[in-house]
Amino acid sequence: MVFGSAASEKTPEEILKGVALMLDEIINDTTVPRNIRAAAEKAKEAVLKEGEEPIVRSATAIHILDEISNDPNMPLHTRTQIWSIVSELERVK
C-alpha cells in the first residue's frame, strides 16, 4: 500500500463534484435557514459552472460560503459541514 501516491489523488473535477454532493445535503436540509440554503445553492452553481477553470469555480464557492459561515442562525452541524466543504475546495489546484 502506497500512501500519498498520485493514483489516490482526486482530480479537481472529482473534488468539485464531491463538493456539489455535500452542498446538496445542506440545500435539502429543512432545518437550515432559507438564506443559508440559498447561499449553498449559489455555491453549488459556482462549483458546477461550465467554462471556468476549476480554481476559479472553487474560489468563487469559498467566497460565498465564507460570507455565510459566521451567520448566528446557522445550526452547528451545518457550520461544520461548511468548514469541511471549504477544506475540500482549498484542495483544488
From Swiss-Prot:
<comment type="similarity">
    <text>Belongs to the UPF0147 family.</text>
</comment>
<dbReference type="InterPro" id="IPR005354">
    <property type="entry name" value="UPF0147"/>
</dbReference>
<dbReference type="InterPro" id="IPR023130">
    <property type="entry name" value="Ta0600-like_sf"/>
</dbReference>
<dbReference type="Pfam" id="PF03685">
    <property type="entry name" value="UPF0147"/>
</dbReference>
<protein>
    <recommendedName>
        <fullName>UPF0147 protein MJ1419</fullName>
    </recommendedName>
</protein>
